[in-house]
């Protein structure tokens, strides 16, 4: 029973104790509620720009219904009615007994004085705090490149110092250290007190600058491998030689840059040199090739000129067989030969004649026939350079009748000169020998049997209106004067030629325009000066195709008492007639002016031309002949005395000339129109 009473007493005590506590609490609460709220002091804050800043306002006693407000200056932060009063980077967090003002990124605008106010029904309390925003240090290129500063000191050897930031009134102070006393910035460095040595960690040494009273301005000298304001950051170890490293690491970069520049420059120079070498090589090769081509061209031109010269100098074509000698032309057939115009131009052939007396007025005449054409040559030089053949047609008289073309007048040209300027020719066919009586009527040359009886030479020559030895007779009539025939000598040296076939360059001489009709007795027969022809005058009319004229001598020749003149046979040019008929002809009148007319028909001349191929033109529709008559002085190369040669010498001379004509037949493929006797 006694234990139960104790328990009850204990219980009773517990109850009483609780009541006592509650009473005490009520008393305390009554006392707190009766007093106004109070706030704790806030320390001054200094924050680097860009970092987070937290300001905490806390009440001393816990009282119900406490209300906190923040002010910057006189302006409330985060007012309800003013939404713009609270910046985005500022936040306010409230609790029962405290309130926090959080600035996420401090800036220079956040620098200033802040005020915290707490209030309730009993009263209010206010606390102020100063906030300092330190700007970020401005690092120059020396700091970024870790370039060390050299400190002037008494000692020679100076240790490399580490750059540290010293915050002092928004200024960055660069400090250096050395063995012994150090000097930097506004004053000397002083080691921190024992209490402040813990500011630097990782074995760093703490220093304070003289003249700065703030306890927060410290500088740490970090050991190798650490960096930062308090040596909290690690830095890779770098070994730097103080003798050579003078804080100019840019020199290394500059040296590297120079090396690169030199390398690139060298490569460019090498490329330029190689390009120049290639250009020079190509130029040399091109020059050599051009020189070779020029040499080949000169050699080819030289060989061609040499071949042309050799070809001109050779008397015969090597493709053709050499001419046969001692060929007798008597009683032989003469083939149709073709003499090239080029050989006639290149070679000058002379035939010597001897003068003889006049024996008859009806025999021994040399006839030159002209054939006028409808077309005129473009110039004297054109007619001279044309590739027409120049030929002398030798005919033998077989009939005694005189022949005159009924279609028009006929021109005559004297073969030898008398005492006057121009002696006129005459057409005679009187001979006892008949052409048809020969054993070979088509190709037989009866004029070659005896030296005393020779056939006259018939020329096809152009006759200019200004010719000194030509006169025009009216149609249906002809004037002829007999001239003595001449004997032919095979030796050019003995007899001076009256007939000369000269190259075309000798015929390109200019002549005077004066007409010789006014002075017929003067000698105008010089080779280099012929007044009958002039370079500026019109070229001669093209000639008609000559018909076959037959002449023969029947009497012996007598020496002539008059000096003979040279007759130069100029070149003859082929002309083509569209109709092929024989038109007007001109006859030459001699000084003795004896007229004669013939009545032989034109058909008989054509028949004789067809039967005698080497005395006529094979194609009368394709060619006509043209030539110019030139004369020389009587005393130039004519022998006044007549000479007679033997039959053997005459035949040898004629055979050589005929063989040359035979050799040129295959090469030129033209009709033979000349046979030199």
Swiss-Prot record:
Biased composition (Low complexity): 351-375, 591-600
InterPro entries per record: EGF-like_dom, Ig-like_dom, Ig-like_dom_sf, Ig-like_fold, Ig_I-set, Ig_sub, Ig_sub2, Neuregulin
PANTHER family: HEREGULIN-NEUREGULIN FAMILY MEMBER, PRO-NEUREGULIN-1, MEMBRANE-BOUND ISOFORM
UniProt modification remark: Proteolytic cleavage close to the plasma membrane on the external face leads to the release of the soluble growth factor form. Extensive glycosylation precedes the proteolytic cleavage.
Cystine pairs: 57-116, 192-206, 200-220, 222-231
Lineage: Eukaryota, Metazoa, Chordata, Craniata, Vertebrata
Name of the protein: Pro-neuregulin-1, membrane-bound isoform
Organism the protein comes from: Xenopus laevis (African clawed frog)
Pfam (any one): I-set
């Amino acid at each position: 029973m006694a234990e139960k009473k104790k328990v009850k007493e204990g219980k009773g005590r517990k109850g009483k104790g609780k009541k006592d506590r509650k009473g005490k609490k009520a008393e305390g609460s009554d006392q707190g509620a009766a007093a106004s709220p109070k706030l704790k002091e806030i320390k001054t804050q200094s924050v680097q720009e860009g970092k987070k800043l937290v300001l905490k306002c806390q009440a001393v006693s816990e009282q119900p219904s406490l209300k906190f407000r923040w002010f910057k200056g006189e302006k409330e932060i985060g007012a309800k009615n003013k939404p713009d009063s609270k910046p985005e980077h500022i936040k306010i967090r409230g609790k029962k007994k405290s309130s926090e003002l959080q600035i996420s990124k401090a800036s220079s605008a956040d620098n200033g004085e802040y005020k915290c106010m707490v209030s309730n029904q009993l009263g209010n309390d206010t606390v102020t705090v100063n906030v300092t925003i330190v700007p970020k240090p401005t690092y120059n290129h020396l700091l970024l490149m870790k370039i060390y500063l050299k400190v002037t000191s008494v000692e020679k050897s100076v240790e490399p110092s580490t750059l540290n930031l010293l915050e002092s009134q928004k200024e960055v102070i660069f400090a250096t250290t050395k063995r012994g006393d150090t000097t930097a910035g506004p004053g000397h460095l002083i080691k921190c007190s024992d209490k402040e040595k813990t500011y630097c960690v990782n074995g760093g040494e703490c220093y304070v600058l003289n003249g700065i009273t703030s306890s927060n301005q410290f500088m740490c000298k970090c050991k190798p491998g650490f960096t930062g304001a308090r040596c909290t950051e690690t830095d890779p170890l770098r070994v730097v030689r103080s003798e050579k490293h003078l804080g100019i690491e840019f020199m290394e970069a500059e040296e590297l840059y120079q090396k690169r520049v030199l390398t690139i420059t060298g490569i460019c120079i090498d490329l330029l040199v190689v390009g120049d070498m290639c250009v020079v090589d190509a130029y040399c090769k091109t020059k050599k090739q051009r020189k070779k081509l020029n040499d080949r061209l000169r050699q080819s031109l030289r060989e061609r000129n040499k071949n042309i010269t050799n070809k001109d100098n050779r008397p015969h074509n090597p493709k053709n067989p050499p001419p046969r000698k001692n060929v007798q032309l008597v009683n032989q057939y003469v083939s149709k030969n073709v003499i090239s115009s080029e050989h006639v131009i290149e070679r000058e052939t002379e035939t010597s004649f001897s003068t003889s007396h006049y024996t008859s007025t009806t025999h021994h005449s040399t006839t030159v026939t002209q054939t006028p054409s409808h077309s005129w040559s473009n110039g004297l030089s054109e007619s001279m350079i044309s590739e027409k053949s120049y030929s002398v047609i030798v005919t033998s008289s077989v009939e005694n009748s005189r022949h005159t073309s009924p279609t028009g007048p006929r021109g005559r040209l004297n073969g030898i000169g008398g005492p006057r300027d121009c002696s006129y020719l005459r057409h005679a066919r009187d001979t006892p020998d008949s052409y048809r009586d020969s054993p070979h009527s088509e190709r037989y040359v009866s004029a070659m049997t005896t030296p005393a009886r020779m056939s006259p030479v018939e020329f096809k020559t152009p006759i200019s209106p200004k010719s000194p030895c030509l006169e025009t007779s009216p149609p249906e009539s002809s004037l002829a004067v007999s001239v003595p025939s001449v004997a032919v000598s095979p030796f050019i040296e003995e007899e001076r030629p009256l007939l000369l076939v000269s190259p075309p360059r000798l015929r390109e001489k200019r002549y005077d325009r004066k007409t010789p009709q006014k002075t017929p007795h003067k000698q105008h027969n010089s080779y280099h000066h012929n007044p009958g022809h002039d370079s500026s005058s019109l070229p001669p009319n093209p000639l008609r195709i000559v018909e076959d004229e037959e002449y023969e001598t029947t009497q012996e020749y007598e020496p002539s008492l008059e000096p003979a003149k040279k007759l130069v046979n100029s070149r003859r040019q082929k002309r083509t007639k569209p109709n092929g008929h024989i038109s007007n002809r001109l006859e030459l009148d001699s000084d003795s002016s004896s007229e004669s007319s013939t009545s032989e028909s034109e058909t008989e001349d054509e028949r004789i031309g067809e039967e005698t191929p080497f005395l006529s033109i094979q194609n009368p529709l394709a060619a006509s002949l043209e030539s110019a008559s030139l004369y020389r002085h009587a005393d130039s190369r004519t022998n006044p005395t007549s000479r007679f040669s033997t039959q053997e010498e005459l035949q040898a001379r004629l055979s050589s000339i005929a063989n040359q004509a035979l050799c040129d037949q295959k090469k030129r493929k033209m009709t033979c129109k000349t046979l030199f006797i």
